[in-house]
A protein has these predicted regions:
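Serine-dependent carboxylesterase/thioesterase catalytic core
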Residues: 8-19, 23-28, 47-225, 239-256, ...
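Hydrophobic helix-cap positions at the C-terminus of alpha-helices
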Residues: 35, 70, 98, 343-346, ...
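A short beta-strand-loop structural module common to alpha/beta enzyme folds
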Residues: 38-48
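Terminal low-complexity/disordered tails
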Residues: 180-192, 196, 201-203, 210-421
Length: 421
């Protein structure tokens, strides 16, 4: 029993729409045709090749449709993917569809820098502090400033500051939400290690550059980690005390606290009315309450200002670090860097078989290239050793698929599940 078709989809990497290795006259294609004959069919999947997360995700959606159509048109064929560089990430994102992933017999990745993307744990406390502080401190400070000055004209400054704080808070929330959604989209599917072949070259320039960029990814979150370090203990103490107060005071204590807050609000309103020269309605002009309400928002505002000032002073450094991430990771990952961790690794998460080619093995016999000529990142798909490894991998996967199909047929004939000895 033999397969009628072996269909291999070739996926190029970044900035390589017209690369030669996916063409019929390339060494890889010629060698595979020689070994597998007429039953081998090669298809090329072109995509933009832009070094952007959105470009790779968009290409993954199109590749998913491309593979689904091939499987629908050739259900009895064995389907493989061979990808180079970020084309491997495109293929992995396409296989996030579990149904499609189960129908792909194997994936070969040449020099793929697998991007591991995770949401930053450090952004939670710092982000929460900035959001709550900006939303809650500005109206209190506005009222306190009105009370202290007694002049209407001075109310414009805190009002503008408050509106800017709300706008900044909303932008911060949108920024963080978008970044975490991007991280979720850039996750890898679950695959059996026997269905993935990884080939890499010693001295891969792209991997070295991406590895260095991972350090800038870590440093870019320093402002938020700093805010988180400052605010973590106060937030924890507030949460602990709030639990204690609720447990000890109960419903009666909470009602008393709410009543006290109501008195504070009425006192503040009376002073605002006085500052605006509006006829006052009854309010409790209690000096201690007024003083408490005046100092509390000022303390909150000063604390917020201190917490916001440190990361603000570090903005130039942050922009400098993000600039170093633009070229290796693309602008989306660079912008999301304060909220996500991005590292380029030799493999996806898990246990895999990886073949590391030496510098000499990256050259075809009788090649006239010098030892320093050409990019090692682009030499793998022309390596005789790499092409032989791909051929062996394809043969092993075909044999495994054949055994599986024969076992399924035997089970149907015997009416029971075939048990391996």
């Amino acid at each position: 029993m033999a397969f009628d078709h072996i269909i291999i989809t070739l996926v190029h990497g970044t900035w390589a729409r017209h690369t030669r290795w996916v063409q019929d006259d390339s060494r890889l294609c010629q060698q595979l045709r020689t070994r597998f004959g007429d039953r081998l069919h090669l298809t090329r999947f072109p995509w933009s090749g832009w070094n952007q997360a959105s470009a790779r995700l968009s290409a993954a959606k199109r590749l998913r449709v491309h593979l689904q159509k091939l499987i629908l048109d050739h259900p009895e064929a064995e389907h493989f993917i061979i990808a180079h560089s970020h084309g491997g990430n495109v293929a992995m994102y396409a296989l996030q569809d579990d149904t499609l992933e189960a129908k792909i017999s194997g994936l070969v990745c040449f020099s793929t820098p697998f991007l591991h993307v995770y949401s930053r744990e450090a952004s939670r406390g710092g982000g929460e502090t900035l959001r709550l502080g900006m939303l809650n401190a500005w109206p209190l400070f506005l009222i306190a400033l009105l009370i202290a000055s007694g002049q209407v004209k001075n109310s414009a400054a805190p009002l503008v500051i408050g509106l800017l704080a709300i706008l900044g808070c909303l932008l911060f929330i949108l920024w963080e939400t978008w970044s975490k959604q991007l991280a979720e989209q850039l996750q890898f599917p679950s695959m059996k290690h026997t269905r993935l072949l990884l080939l890499r070259a010693t001295g891969d320039e792209a991997s070295a550059a991406l590895g260095g960029a991972g350090c800038f990814s870590w440093l870019s979150a320093f402002p938020i980690r700093l805010v988180n370090a400052i605010s973590a203990r106060p937030l924890r103490l507030i949460a602990q005390h709030a639990t204690t107060i609720r447990a000890r005071a109960g419903v009666v204590g909470i009602r008393i606290a709410l009543l006290a807050c109501a008195f504070v609000v009425l006192d503040a309103i009376s002073h605002v009315q006085s500052a605006l020269r509006i006829h006052q309605w009854l309010g409790p002009p209690i000096a201690p309450v007024w003083f408490t309400y005046l100092t509390a928002p000022l303390a909150i505002y000063v604390g917020l200002l201190f917490a916001s000032l440190l990361p603000t002073l570090l903005v130039p450094i942050l922009l400098f670090l993000l600039g170093f991430m633009l070229l290796p990771f693309g602008w989306e990952v660079a912008i999301a860097a304060p909220f996500i961790e991005t590292f380029a690794e030799a493999t996806p998460p898990g246990t895999w078989n990886i073949i590391q080619l030496s510098r000499r093995e990256c050259l075809w016999p009788r090649d006239e290239e010098s030892e320093t000529g050409g990019l090692r990142h682009s030499a793998v798909y022309d390596s005789q050793r790499a092409i032989l490894e791909v051929a062996v991998f394809l043969a092993e996967r075909l044999n495994a698929a054949l055994r599986e199909k024969l076992g399924s047929q035997l089970s149907q004939l015997s009416g029971k599940t075939r048990v391996k000895p």
